[in-house]
Amino acid sequence: MLVLVLGDLHIPHRCNTLPAKFKKLLVPGKIQHILCTGNLCTKESYDYLKTLAGDVHIVRGDFDENLNYPEQKVVTVGQFKIGLIHGHQVIPWGDMASLALLQRQLDVDILISGHTHKFEAFENENKFYINPGSATGAYSALESNITPSFVLMDIQASTVVTYVYQLIGDDVKVERIEYKKS
């Protein structure tokens, strides 16, 4: 089962569109679920995601026009409970102890957060944490030189194989990370 994880697009305020090389990779009909950390900013970005997969889950970012998106969401995909937040609620941003506390409160196997615009994926105390970064490479409050990135999770039974796509220069680099639920 393929799950696209992305966020912080900031279209059209900070970027015009997704990188063309990413759009070529994101083909309708291949992805079953989309988990978005927010800051899509417009309905057009949401509509684009709906063309890629029927099951789209979005949480509200601090720049989203649609205030109906929830602050946080828990989604079950296969054997995994996945928590989804934007990340501006985590103080300091991206802080491991704060993320771990939120993971315990939501009682999830995987916690997905954004806001920092920097890709991260790691295991801590048998739980998995993912920050997909910014799919467009939009600048953040702390940094202007952001590497565009998104994550594709392949969920099979009690294993998640995470593929990280990063646009470095003119090339899309892919890294593979595996997490097994214990």
UniProtKB/Swiss-Prot annotation:
Component of the commander complex that is essential for endosomal recycling of transmembrane cargos; the commander complex is composed of the CCC subcomplex and the retriever subcomplex. Component of the retriever complex, which is a heterotrimeric complex related to retromer cargo-selective complex (CSC) and essential for retromer-independent retrieval and recycling of numerous cargos. Component of the retromer cargo-selective complex (CSC). Component of the commander complex consisting of the CCC subcomplex and the retriever subcomplex. Component of the heterotrimeric retriever complex formed by vps26c, vps29 and vps35l; within the complex interacts with vps35l. Component of the heterotrimeric retromer cargo-selective complex (CSC), also described as vacuolar protein sorting subcomplex (VPS), formed by vps26 (vps26a or vps26b), vps29 and vps35. The CSC has a highly elongated structure with vps26 and vps29 binding independently at opposite distal ends of vps35 as central platform. One of its GO terms (cellular component) is endosome membrane. It comes from the Eukaryota. It is a peripheral membrane protein. GO terms for molecular function: metal ion binding. This is Vacuolar protein sorting-associated protein 29. It is found in: Cytoplasm; Membrane; Endosome membrane. Belongs to the VPS29 family. One of its GO terms (biological process) is intracellular protein transport. InterPro entries: Calcineurin-like_PHP_lpxH, Metallo-depent_PP-like, Phosphodiesterase_MJ0936/Vps29, Vps29. Keywords: Cytoplasm, Endosome, Membrane, Metal-binding, Protein transport, Transport, Zinc.
